[in-house]
C-alpha cells in the first residue's frame, strides 16, 4: 500500500472518532431568556418552558453557552441586563459578567469531549449541564462547589464524555 493511501486511511479513522454534538437548551425560568453561544450558536430568544437545539461541529474548542436576561432587541441590536455581548442578538463575543457558563470542547481528546460549568465570570442563573453518558453537573447558586463548577482559574472541574454524544443544558432547573 502506498504512503499516501496509508495517510488517507489514518486521517479517515481519526476524523471518524469525533463528530458533531447537539446541545438541547431548556428554559425552566419563569421568564424569557436569550441563550447565546460562541464560537457557534449566536443567540436567540427562548420563552419560558421552551426548548431549542444548536449543533456544534466536531473540533470546536473552548465553546461557551450562557443565558442572557432582561434583554430588549429591535432587529438584531439591543441590550441585556446580564450576559450582554456587545448589544447584539447573535453573539460573536463572550457575554459580559455576570453570566453562568456552560463550557465545552467537542472532540478535543480525539474520541472524548470535555465540559464544565463556570462561575468565574459571575452567576446569573442556575444551570444543569450534562452529556448523555457523563456526569450531570448542577450549579444552583453563586457558591456552587467544585467539582460542580469552576469558581477560580485553578479549579479542576472539567469532566469528560465519550465522543458522539449529545448535551442537555437547563436554565433554572
Curated annotation (Swiss-Prot):
One of its GO terms (biological process) is defense response. It comes from the Eukaryota. Residues 1-20 form the signal peptide. It comes from Hordeum vulgare (Barley). SMART domains: THN (SM00205). Keywords: Pathogenesis-related protein, Plant defense, Signal. Belongs to the thaumatin family. Pfam families: Thaumatin. InterPro entries: Osmotin/thaumatin-like_sf, Thaumatin, Thaumatin_CS. This is Pathogenesis-related protein 1A/1B. CDD domains: TLP-P. SUPFAM superfamilies: Osmotin, thaumatin-like protein.
Amino acid at each position: 500500500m502506498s504512503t499516501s493511501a496509508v495517510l488517507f486511511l489514518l486521517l479517515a479513522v481519526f476524523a471518524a472518532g469525533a463528530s458533531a454534538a447537539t446541545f438541547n437548551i431548556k428554559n425552566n425560568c419563569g421568564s424569557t431568556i436569550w441563550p447565546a453561544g460562541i464560537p457557534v450558536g449566536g443567540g436567540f430568544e427562548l420563552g419560558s418552558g421552551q426548548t431549542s437545539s444548536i449543533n456544534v461541529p466536531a473540533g470546536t474548542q473552548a465553546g461557551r453557552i450562557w443565558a442572557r436576561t432582561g434583554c430588549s432587541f429591535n432587529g438584531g441590536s439591543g441590550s441585556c441586563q446580564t450576559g450582554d455581548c456587545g448589544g447584539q442578538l447573535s453573539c460573536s463575543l463572550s457575554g459580559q459578567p455576570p453570566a453562568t457558563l456552560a463550557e465545552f470542547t467537542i472532540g478535543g481528546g480525539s474520541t472524548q469531549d470535555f465540559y464544565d460549568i463556570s462561575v468565574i465570570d459571575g452567576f446569573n442563573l442556575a444551570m444543569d449541564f450534562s452529556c448523555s453518558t457523563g456526569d450531570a453537573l448542577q450549579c444552583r447558586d453563586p457558591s456552587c462547589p467544585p467539582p460542580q463548577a469552576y469558581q477560580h482559574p485553578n479549579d479542576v472541574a472539567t469532566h469528560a464524555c465519550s465522543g458522539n454524544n449529545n448535551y442537555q443544558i437547563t436554565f433554572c432547573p
